[in-house]
Amino acid sequence: MRRAVCFPALCLLLNLHAAGCFSGNNDHFLAINQKKSGKPVFIYKHSQDIEKSLDIAPQKIYRHSYHSSSEAQVSKRHQIVNSAFPRPAYDPSLNLLAMDGQDLEVENLPIPAANVIVVTLQMDVNKLNITLLRIFRQGVAAALGLLPQQVHINRLIGKKNSIELFVSPINRKTGISDALPSEEVLRSLNINVLHQSLSQFGITEVSPEKNVLQGQHEADKIWSKEGFYAVVIFLSIFVIIVTCLMILYRLKERFQLSLRQDKEKNQEIHLSPITLQPALSEAKTVHSMVQPEQAPKVLNVVVDPQGRGAPEIKATTATSVCPSPFKMKPIGLQERRGSNVSLTLDMSSLGNIEPFVSIPTPREKVAMEYLQSASRILTRSQLRDVVASSHLLQSEFMEIPMNFVDPKEIDIPRHGTKNRYKTILPNPLSRVCLRPKNVTDSLSTYINANYIRGYSGKEKAFIATQGPMINTVDDFWQMVWQEDSPVIVMITKLKEKNEKCVLYWPEKRGIYGKVEVLVISVNECDNYTIRNLVLKQGSHTQHVKHYWYTSWPDHKTPDSAQPLLQLMLDVEEDRLASQGRGPVVVHCSAGIGRTGCFIATSIGCQQLKEEGVVDALSIVCQLRMDRGGMVQTSEQYEFVHHALCLYESRLSAETVQ
């Protein structure tokens, strides 16, 4: 009876021990159970609930005391990869609630950003131990429907309080290249299962995001192949632009330097050194850099050796020398400063003397004699014949001296500021002088204009001047008022590639200095525009007719002389209607080319009408004596003959009628 009672009690005790229900140390039971099941045993009750909720296969999992049929089926289909995390050795003395070893679960691999998933928690990630990380891993695997071995915890991000993880295929070795794309993983994520399984972690966000290591790796890829090419291309373009700018700058400097050298070469006057000797020394010759011919006399400058006496100038005939080819006269310092010409002088042996002596050169004498005496009178038939021989007219034109003015011959300081072209200057003997604003201001009397003689040498029949500049418009209208000019003829556009003339008249009314200009009427003709103007100064008025001829083409002569001839006839009619008034003002840009053509044609037509013959050569020479360079080119010289021939045919037609 007693044995019968003890046997059931003994069996009960054995079953309880096998079930692990003793209150003592049950670590041996945990190890045996884990070995049989192949799964970690959850310490907490909610962890056991998580284990029950993990469904690897859609069928229900039936458990046995020693094996699991579902696990056997799964193992046949997919070979379970052992966890790569090292497990701590079994130590009975360790408390299961405090297993500290989170570094064993964190892989810290440089995973590409496209494969990383970041899970943000409410729980402090710094307090997660290996047990909680395993729970987290299994919960994520359950939400994804994957095995825990496929979920890898890569990093714990303390600043964001989040866990960085990635998922790998089960049949491949875990590695960076095997990680599944984060977007594909998130599409298969069951949010409800995730929150139910890991409610104690307080998951707030699941998103793909770059990790710090990957960000560093991508930052290191700034100098990638594409980036390197982009930088090289940018630097190449920059170098090319800088090089082009430097080349353009150098070309500009060279161009400006060549212009300065040309100007200096044109303006430079080389004067021979003057030999200074004591009073008793013998005379020495003076050599000029240009020697056209020999002269019978030479000048000696004799100076007191002490430099106290006045210089004595004597003429000797002992030696033949070549005088300077330039006409010189005594000039002072103020005059030299007013000129833009550089002088090269040998002043090494000079004392307190004035070394300049005015001597007309043979070349100047010959040029002036030619201008005064040249003549070729043409009858009407000869005029028609010579027009057909352009080469004869060109040869004749080339023999006419230009008679340009040397800047030193103008005794007005700073006169260059009122010249449109530095080499086109008014002849001093025929220059128009304005009434000065005050006695000491000599510049206010200057304007680049000359009186031009007309038919039969009539004085002041015309005024040839340059196109007004912005700073000479007042001077122009002062000249028109002062000379009481009835007609102004303008033969240029305002701009032909470069500025030729400024708009010096108003649209309706304008005041220029002391002269008020009113536009009364405007008449548009085929080739020119006529404006009737009224000039007022105080209580006095003057009527002026302004002709603006715009049909002259750039850099050549017109194809037909008819428009210019008609303009000349209209101006001549107005001039005759205003007898007793001043000269006709004619200007183009420089005041010598087209201006010379108009005046030469006007004089030649009067000569044809009065005498029946014409001397165009003499007319042009007379114009150049009054203003150098008039009728500037051989083409213009031919054009004058064409205009005269056309006028002659008109006269013949009128005679027949």
From Swiss-Prot:
Kindly state the subunit structure of this protein: Interacts with MAPKs.
Q: Where in the cell is it found?
A: Secreted
Descriptive protein name: Receptor-type tyrosine-protein phosphatase R
* Protein EC: 3.1.3.48
Q: Name one GO cellular component term.
A: cytosol
Q: What is its main location?
A: secreted
Residues of the signal peptide: 1-21
Tell me where in this chain the PTM Phosphoserine is found: 272, 339
- Active-site residues, record numbering mapped to chain: 588 (phosphocysteine intermediate)
InterPro entries recorded for this chain? Prot-tyrosine_phosphatase-like, PTP_cat, Tyr_Pase_AS, Tyr_Pase_cat, Tyr_Pase_dom, Tyr_Pase_KIM-con, Tyr_Pase_rcpt_R/non-rcpt_5
Q: In which tissues is it expressed?
A: Detected in cerebrospinal fluid (at protein level). Expressed in brain, placenta, small intestine, stomach, uterus and weakly in the prostate. Isoform alpha has been observed only in the brain. Isoform gamma is expressed in brain, placenta and uterus. Isoform delta is expressed in brain, kidney, placenta, prostate, small intestine and uterus.
Species the sequence originates in: Homo sapiens
What family is this protein classified in?
Answer: Belongs to the protein-tyrosine phosphatase family. Receptor class 7 subfamily.
State a single Gene Ontology molecular function.
protein kinase binding
Residues carrying covalently attached carbohydrate according to the record: 23, 129
Q: Which domain of life is it from?
A: Eukaryota
Residues that, per the record, bind substrate: 554, 588-594, 632
Top EC category: hydrolase
Topological domain, Extracellular: which ranges?
Answer: 22-227
The residue spans the entry assigns to the Cytoplasmic side of the membrane are as follows: 249-657
Gene3D superfamilies in the record, alphabetically?
A: Protein tyrosine phosphatase superfamily
What the entry lists under PROSITE patterns is as follows: TYR_PHOSPHATASE_1 (PS00383), TYR_PHOSPHATASE_2 (PS50056), TYR_PHOSPHATASE_PTP (PS50055)
